[in-house]
């Protein structure tokens, strides 16, 4: 397998940042509503591994549900994948966040001769630029 891209968890807020979130210390503010994924689902386990035990106001069964809470204004901040922020213009990352793991690594492998060209394309600068445009960390 050839790793072609990574995805990592980031703190996101509704566009305009109404809660005036400026850094990781805001994850523990009592006056803000924090949405995360629940323990036992991949995004929840990854969130806990990256940020530790957070005082969440809501624990969702999917990252899409966390994203919905942000979009609807039901949460002031939430932890989602970087690609979710790139795909949803109604949320933003409120401060520069390093691409820290644990992260999801996407790898490709050719199972036949016909797949070799596709795997080579995924590793190309063209494909890497497309992946980066969609929020993935590239290799």
Language-model segments: what does each one mean?
Residues 2-139:
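Exported/periplasmic ABC-transporter solute-binding proteins
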